Amino acid sequence: MAQVTFEEISASDFFYRNRDIAGFTNPTRAIFAAIRELVENSLDAAESIKTPPDIYVRLSFEGEASEETQIYKLRVEDNGCGIPPRHIPSAFGQVLYGSKYKLKQQRGTFGLGGKMAILYGQITTHQPATIISSTSPSSKIFMYKLMIDIQRNRPIILDRKVLLNKEGWRGTVVEFSLEGDYLRAMPKILEYFKQTAMVNPYANITFVDPKGRLYKFVRATTVMPDPPKETLPHPYGVDVELLQRLIQVTPYNSILEFLKNHFHRVGEITAKKFLEFSGVSPSKNPKKLSHEEVVRLVQMLKRFKDFLPPDASCLSPLGEELLKTGVLKELKPEFVAVHQRKPATYAGHPFIVEVAIAYGGEIPQRGGFIIYRFANRIPLLYDEASDVSVKVINAMNWRRYKVSPDMPIAIVVHICSTKVPYKTVGKEFIADRPEVRREIANGLREVARQLQRYLTRREHVDRERKRLGVFSKYLPRIAEFSTKLAGKEKPPDIEKLLRSVKRFGFEGV
């Protein structure tokens, strides 16, 4: 019988062996994923200090890796909050270490993407990453050169320097080499920047590609959405593991105080009602609950119907005005309608759906709707057919709104949540949750009705323009003939008559 060997592997070793699940499936996807993850970290860093983001991305050619792939150096620089020097090595050299594990709306979810980009670069080029950061214009600049110890999931610090901050800079620079196929990735990368600019209209984004071509996406406003707030878990979203963790760290000695202080929107009255419902004494010490009692408590939390729904104040939707600004800036349509749904919940997690529909202008006709999908202001560019938004759009009866897929129409769907229901670690598409599907459908119906009203008005205007054109063409001739027939010298003033048949304003709809 063959001997079976058991071994433990680190988190970085796991993702080294299974990098596909984080979106680094091939050189084309990998270079796109690396840029995306670092840009999103930069956006989060700037927004956390309420500063309109200024992000600079440069991709430089370094050499050929094979017949189909090349080595590039990627540099991403931002004006965000910076990283305290003691955290820099672990923040970039330890997989699943970071600031993304609190319950609030943010682009990052797993504390994984930025480290995966550096890990991928290290695997494919065997070169270290350089991290430069400053947390304040008055503080010093810290520079680290590091690699990841894959087997131990620890940073290897190769060099550390402390520099004077003469220009009063604050932010972070990440620079490393990686293998990729930019020529194949270029359309997705440029589309990513365009869509990021659309849903973050307050950001300046500059991209320099390997051929030195400069792409600038200039902010259209300095107005930013309110930053998201950290929140407590809602009782409906709690499982046994989370409840046990809360019990381990709680300073409270009664289950009543524990419920009031560790759960979202649970006050004393609600907590007492729940404890009566579940048959637990309010004075019982939560640390003395047995495993079976913890399991039963979770089951009762799910069954209790009187918990208040999650409060969406912890969320940071883009808002109708900013969404409209972004769509107008990037798509330049003839007409745009936007709608923000009221907060809703799934599995105890609050979420808000924002939708927009744009028509005409510079939107091309492609024989189908152009669909833009976003989650927490992240563009979702891959696996479109699997996304719940696309399923809802395809299932709608657009004919009732006088809309057909061959019209120049773009549809935007944005979902923000403390926990976006992604189907994969790579954050490529959103799962088909009934609550999310319902909110998307209701939002789309609202903007479709607005578009229908616009198209109806435009039909009336076109009809009246044609009618007025006929009058304008023939009335002068009729007036001239009538003048001669009546033996008059001066023809009547037909402008008054033309104004009387002008029923609509034709300067716009």
Short names for language-model regions:
Residues 22-24, 99-103, 282-284, 420-426:
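Short small-residue beta-strand/loop micro-motif enriched in glycine and branched aliphatics
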Residues 281, 287-360:
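C-terminal extensions
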Residues 104-106, 205-210, 257-261, 275, ...:
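Short coil/turn segments at secondary-structure boundaries
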Residues 2, 72-73, 98-245, 283-300, ...:
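GHKL-type ATPase core
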Residues 251, 256-278:
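Helix-hairpin-helix
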Residues 1-169, 173-177, 259, 266-268:
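GHKL (Bergerat-fold) ATPase N-terminal catalytic module, capturing the glycine-rich phosphate-binding loop
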